[in-house]
A protein has these predicted regions:
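Extreme N-terminal starter segment of soluble prokaryotic enzymes
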Residues: 1-7
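Short, glycine-anchored, charge-dense loop/turn motifs used at functional sites
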Residues: 5, 110-118, 226-234
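N-terminal phosphate-binding loop and adjacent alpha-helix
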Residues: 9-27
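Cys-nucleophile CN-hydrolase/nitrilase-fold catalytic domain and related Cys-dependent amidase chemistry
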Residues: 17, 26-114, 120, 183-203
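Short beta->alpha transition motifs characteristic of CBS
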Residues: 58, 109, 121-127, 224, ...
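CN hydrolase (nitrilase-like) catalytic-core segments centered on the catalytic cysteine
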Residues: 69-89, 150, 160-243
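Active-site catalytic loop in hydrolytic enzyme cores
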Residues: 70, 99-171, 183-192, 196, ...
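C-terminal beta-strand edge segments of enzyme domains
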Residues: 143-145, 210-277
Length: 277
């Protein structure tokens, strides 16, 4: 099965959900055309971490947070997913009221072609500082079976921890989507970990980063789609840009049955020390 993926690398305006959602829809129009015809160019469109709000605005997180699945950004993006007949992944600040008080998460949402929320992922490995002060850590690593493939999600710094991608791969993920806000000067680290997570698990990685400067942080972009042998298929530059690639999911099983036996030849009974440290 072949799946066409687009990563939409943008600069988000801090705290301005209306402007950011307008930009996101305009990028979808650029990919698919500005009429109501169903999009034949891509199946899955990925936006960055906290695309709806911007990243470096922790003082506004509580104000711009939304409950799922009925949040205001979801309504806009669900309509876009339905209009263009595409799956969409994007980042937002989630407000969870299940504990009787607002708890915030750094969350990404997966919408299907009908605009239905297939699922969400809450960032587990928060960056020390405003993230750890504002958000609660996520604790689950879901994989979603869709008609365009089995999709797992990580957010930015999660990719620095190989355990996350390994769990997703063991659960069957074929595509791991990585919305991110990875800042300069750490672009070489970004390159290494996206390719490493692909190679480690023989999966496709679609990593979408921010660009531009917020307050103190500058984001370098370099969004990329990486093949299951850890080689970059396509990479963006340092400005707003859309990259696309068609990936062949059948290639994953072919590779895993050949040289790339990284999942089959694991020796998990010897890994217990990891859990005791």
């Amino acid at each position: 099965m072949k799946t066409k993926i687009a990563c939409v690398q943008i600069k988000s305006e801090l705290g301005d959900k209306t402007a950011n959602l307008k930009k996101m829809v305009s990028k979808l129009e650029k990919i698919c055309g500005d009429n109501d015809d169903k999009c034949s160019k891509v199946d899955l469109v990925v936006f960055p971490e906290l695309a709806v709000t911007g990243y470096e605005c922790s003082e506004l997180y509580a104000e711009v947070a939304e409950e799922l699945p009925g949040g205001d950004s979801v309504k806009v993006m669900a309509e876009a997913a339905k209009r263009f007949n595409v799956y969409i992944v994007y980042g937002l600040v989630e407000k969870d009221m299940s504990e009787g008080k607002p708890v915030l998460y750094n969350t990404v949402v997966l919408l299907d072609r009908s605009g239905v929320v297939v699922g969400k992922y809450r960032k587990s490995h928060l960056v020390e500082g405003p993230e750890t002060e504002s958000f609660k850590k996520g604790t689950e690593y879901p994989v979603f079976e869709t008609e365009i493939g089995k999709i797992g999600m990580m957010i930015c710094w999660d990719t620095a921890y190989p355990e996350v991608a390994r769990i997703l791969a063991l659960k069957g993920a074929e595509i791991i989507v990585v919305p991110a806000a990875w800042e300069a000067p750490y672009d070489e680290d970004w390159d290494i970990v996206q390719c490493a997570r692909s190679f480690d698990n023989v999966v496709y990685v679609a990593a979408c980063n921010h660009v531009g400067t917020d307050n103190d942080l500058t984001f370098f972009g370099k969004s990329k789609i990486v093949g299951p042998t850890g080689r970059t298929i396509i990479e963006a530059g340092n400005d707003e840009e859309i990259i696309t690639a068609e990936v062949d999911l059948d290639r994953i099983s072919e590779l895993r049955e050949g040289f790339y036996v990284l999942l089959k030849d694991r020796n998990p009974e010897t890994y217990g020390e990891i859990l005791n440290r």
